[in-house]
UniProtKB/Swiss-Prot annotation:
Positions of disulphide bridges: none
Molecular function GO labels: 4 iron, 4 sulfur cluster binding; iron ion binding; RNA binding; rRNA (uridine-C5-)-methyltransferase activity
Enzyme class: transferase
Organism: Thiobacillus denitrificans (strain ATCC 25259 / T1)
Domain TRAM: 1-54
Entry function: Catalyzes the formation of 5-methyl-uridine at position 1939 (m5U1939) in 23S rRNA.
Lineage top rank: taxon: Bacteria
Binding site for S-adenosyl-L-methionine: 264, 293, 298, 314, 341, 362
Catalytic site: 389 (nucleophile)
This enzyme's EC code(s): 2.1.1.190
Keyword Methyltransferase listed: yes
Top-level taxonomy: Bacteria, Pseudomonadati, Pseudomonadota, Betaproteobacteria, Nitrosomonadales
Name of the protein this chain belongs to: 23S rRNA (uracil(1939)-C(5))-methyltransferase RlmD
Family per record: Belongs to the class I-like SAM-binding methyltransferase superfamily. RNA M5U methyltransferase family. RlmD subfamily.
Annotated gene: rlmD
Length: 432
């Protein structure tokens, strides 16, 4: 007989947390305040992992998942929780990490940045596999806790134009002679363009190429092919096509990019996040500002648009070349860019860059610990805006900024970049 537990809270991955015979048990599919019948699928020394078999007393915040693949597909984990409650849970994750890891609390909690809950995702990496037992080729995300690919024909969080391609892609690849040599497809949607980058372990033959060209024409998409690393990606069809781009209309900017270059998956939240970052940073003419981990200039160019002299630093040579091109195309001579490995920052290297009035930091999940440890004791930037995709590393870096470098955590809040997932995007303001 399956045990019944009361769900006490949600963990940072969106699992229900219960106690069973004194042992912490993480319950997939259960919400705080619910009573659930569970089935344990893995026992560890200090905790159990379980699935909710039946919800005996549902939470008022429980929602009916919109996606028919929810529960099997691993792309989403929180569709069963009402959207506003998802955001509240992410805000709690941010606050708990700041308090527990960073030993800091923000003076102000910023209101969460919201956007569309469905059809928001313009970027995805779709796995491909021929599975005859499932009727042919599968294209989509992996199943939950599995290397298998979910049997899906659409996706509710992908942009509608991208979601509508999943079933046609399954049919296309099923007709190709090298279907077993296409492990994945990278999808990138701009404001008016969709690009599909096929990862190819062997090239298409003439018949395959004809099928792919016909598919691209019929579905109004561009097809690229990638033989090895991302740098090998190149256009396949059509020969002449408009470039990918996204806009930051508040600043009058158009940002072209290659499909293999990093951009945020959620364009609406990206616009809101850039707007908030600029309000918090408040760049002014004559100020000298650094944008670290600048990518293709997502924050750098809006800062330059406000008249500040801004130096963007990024470890990728390709992204810096793109950022320089974007600055030129948007007529922003106040934006300069350099290539440097910010994970190897030292106080000496930071001092050589010259003094900065303000700093914007937007690192990957690993954070920016070497940068914050390298800030000078005297003459440090008086204001830092930190954009984070991992609250744990933000909290770790905040501890150094506040307790070692003398900054105050003035404000922090979340941006719901990935609705229906446990991913927490956040932004924080530090001042001294």
């Amino acid at each position: 007989m399956n045990p019944v537990v009361d769900i006490l809270s949600l963990d940072h991955e969106g699992h229900g947390v219960a106690r069973l015979d004194g042992k912490v048990t993480f319950v997939d599919g259960a919400l705080a305040g619910e009573r659930a019948e569970i089935a344990i699928f893995r026992k560890h020394a200090k905790y159990n992992s379980a699935n909710a078999v039946a919800i005996l007393a549902p939470s008022a915040q429980r929602a009916e998942p919109r996606c028919r693949y929810f529960g099997r597909c691993g792309g989403c984990s929180m569709q069963h929780l009402e959207p506003s409650a998802q955001v509240a849970a992410k805000q709690r994750v941010l606050e708990e990490n700041l308090a527990r890891i960073g030993k800091v609390r923000p003076s102000v909690l910023l209101p969460a940045l919201h956007g569309p809950s469905w059809g928001y995702r313009g970027r995805a990496r779709l796995s491909v596999r021929r599975v005859e037992k499932k009727g042919g080729v599968l294209v989509g995300f992996h199943e939950k806790r599995s290397s298998f690919i979910a049997d899906m024909a659409s996706c509710e969080v992908l942009a509608p134009g991208v979601s509508a391609l999943i079933q046609p892609l399954r049919e296309l690849i099923g007709r190709l002679s090298n279907a077993d040599r296409i492990p994945q497809i990278e999808v990138a949607a701009g404001e008016h363009v969709i690009v599909l980058v096929f990862r190819l372990l062997e090239p298409w033959n003439d018949d395959d190429a004809a099928h792919v060209r016909a598919f691209a024409d019929a579905h109004h998409v561009q097809v690229w092919e990638q033989r090895k690393g991302p740098e090998t990606a190149r256009p396949f069809w059509p020969d002449i096509a408009p470039e990918l781009s996204y806009g930051l209309p508040e600043f009058g900017l158009v940002m072209p990019f290659r499909p293999t270059e990093f951009t945020q998956v959620n364009s609406a939240i990206n616009r809101a996040l850039v707007s908030r970052a600029l309000r918090l940073l408040d760049p002014r003419p004559g100020e000298r500002i650094a944008d670290l981990f600048c990518g293709l200039g997502n924050f750098t160019l809006p800062i330059a648009h406000r008249g500040a002299d801004v130096l963007g630093i990024e470890g990728s040579t390709e992204l810096v070349a793109r950022a320089r091109e974007n600055a030129l195309r948007n007529a922003l001579p106040h934006a300069r860019f350099e290539v440097d490995n910010l994970f190897e920052m030292t106080p000496e290297k930071f001092a050589a860059l010259g003094p900065f009035d303000k700093l914007l930091i937007d690192p990957p999940r690993s954070g920016a610990i070497e940068v914050v440890k390298s800030l000078p004791e005297a003459g440090a930037p008086r204001r830092i805006v930190y954009v984070s995709c991992d609250p744990a590393t933000l909290a770790r870096d905040a501890e150094v900024l506040v307790h070692v470098k003398g900054y105050r955590l003035e404000a922090a809040g979340v941006a719901n970049m990935f609705p229906h997932t446990a991913h927490v995007e956040s932004i924080a303001l530090f001042e001294r």
